[in-house]
Regions:
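Amphipathic alpha-helical recognition patches that constitute DNA-binding helices
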Residues: 2-3, 10, 27, 69, ...
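Residue-level signal for discrete positions within transmembrane alpha-helices
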Residues: 14, 114, 118, 154-161, ...
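An internal, D/E-rich "acidic patch" concept
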Residues: 65-134
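Hydrophobic alpha-helical transmembrane segments of membrane transport/permease proteins
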Residues: 18-75, 179-200
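Membrane-interface helix starts
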Residues: 8, 12-16, 70, 308
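N-terminal Sec/SRP start-transfer signal
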Residues: 1-13, 244-245
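Membrane-water interface segments at the C-terminal ends of transmembrane alpha-helices
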Residues: 27-31, 155-185, 213-219
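Alpha-helical transmembrane segments of integral membrane proteins
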Residues: 4, 115-119, 124, 128-148, ...
Length: 341
């Protein structure tokens, strides 16, 4: 019962934060010097008399509700106030994410394919990164001060210091230009109409180089963090006691020390998973992948602010869900942290 109350309380906090962030983001995008009504009539400007154009412009502004204050427009956009044209609630909370002025489609139709691609590449990048950094960090902590540990520390510092776009350019030159192992860009074999697993492997092949870049870019920080957490855990008194009692080293490391190191590592893992959604903006543009990051940059360049705002809200929801998962994970992995307390 206490767990349920805690979860409900946390969800209530997240809903409050969601509304605050969404209002701030809506106000921020409304400060951008752009007029949707004028943009919509721009193609007709030369064919209309100035007075006719101005009358149509004012009528369209009134029809679109642009003459209302920002609070009224936010409530209408969110779905808390009735739409001016239909008289019904038809906003974000009802599933209406707006209309893309550039693609001439509903925002939902525009963002569905890129969302799938972004989630696909980020999940695989997370699996690869964790599969390398956790064993590597544990091994370096156990063999602290050894040659391999010293080499890894130097290597991770170098990797951590290099911006992700530099890593991407270097890897493109090595693996795509020199070795020709992977394609430079794209999301599938041109002209191919694969289905099933063949389509999956073809897509994975084209995503391989971006995945390698994202994984390599994460090795430095994550490996050092896991190593540091494990060194702290191995220095605890109960670990020394377990070793003094003759407990097997593998049991000491993986059953006792790793469990204590897991709490800060969980924060890192989930936080990093959320950060690569924003980091994928660079990767998707570098490799010309049809993902949320590339779509977001395109929306800003094309002054498609309803689309950009919807993408920003997607990142907000992902971050809030991640924060909830972190809080709930603490009580699951560490007996010292209990939700009912």
């Amino acid at each position: 019962m206490a767990v349920t109350k805690y979860i409900l309380r946390r969800i209530a906090y997240l809903i409050l934060v969601f509304f605050i962030v969404s209002f701030l983001m809506y106000c921020l995008y409304n400060l951008i010097p752009s007029d949707p009504a004028r943009n919509q009539l721009e193609g007709m400007k030369k064919s209309l008399k100035p007075e006719v154009y101005e009358r149509m412009y004012q009528e369209l502004r009134e029809e679109m509700g642009l003459n209302d204050n920002v609070l009224v427009r936010y409530a209408r956009w969110m779905g808390l106030s009735a739409d001016k044209q239909t008289g019904k609630l038809h906003g974000l909370l009802e599933g209406n994410f707006g209309y893309s002025s550039y693609f001439k489609k509903n925002v939902v139709e525009v963002i569905l394919p890129p969302i799938g691609n972004t989630i696909f590449i980020n999940i695989f990048a997370t699996i690869l990164a964790l599969g390398i950094t956790i064993p590597l960090g544990i091994y370096c902590a156990v063999h602290k001060g050894g040659k391999f540990d010293n080499f890894t520390q130097v290597f991770t510092i170098i990797g951590y210091s290099i911006p992700i776009y530099i890593i991407a350019l270097v890897f493109i030159y090595i693996f795509a230009v020199l070795l020709r192992w992977f394609p430079v860009s794209g999301m599938g074999t041109p002209g191919a109409e694969y289905t099933g697993m063949r389509a999956f492997w073809d897509k994975l092949y084209y995503f391989s180089l971006p995945l390698i870049v994202m994984t390599f870019g994460s090795l430095g920080g994550m490996t050092r963090y896991v190593r540091s957490a494990m060194i702290d855990a191995l220095s605890m008194d109960h670990i020394k006691t377990a070793r003094a009692k003759g407990v097997r080293e593998k049991v000491v490391i993986y059953s006792h020390a790793w469990r204590n190191a897991l709490l800060p590592v969980i924060t890192l893992i989930i936080g990093w998973f959320l950060s690569i959604f924003s980091g994928s903006v660079i990767i998707e543009n570098t490799f010309n992948l049809n993902g949320m990051g590339k779509l977001y940059i395109g929306a800003l360049n094309n002054h498609d602010y309803e689309l950009a705002l919807a993408i920003q809200m997607f990142y907000t929801v992902v971050s809030l869900i991640g924060a909830l998962v972190i809080d709930l994970s603490y009580g699951l992995v560490d007996p010292r942290v209990r939700i009912d307390k």
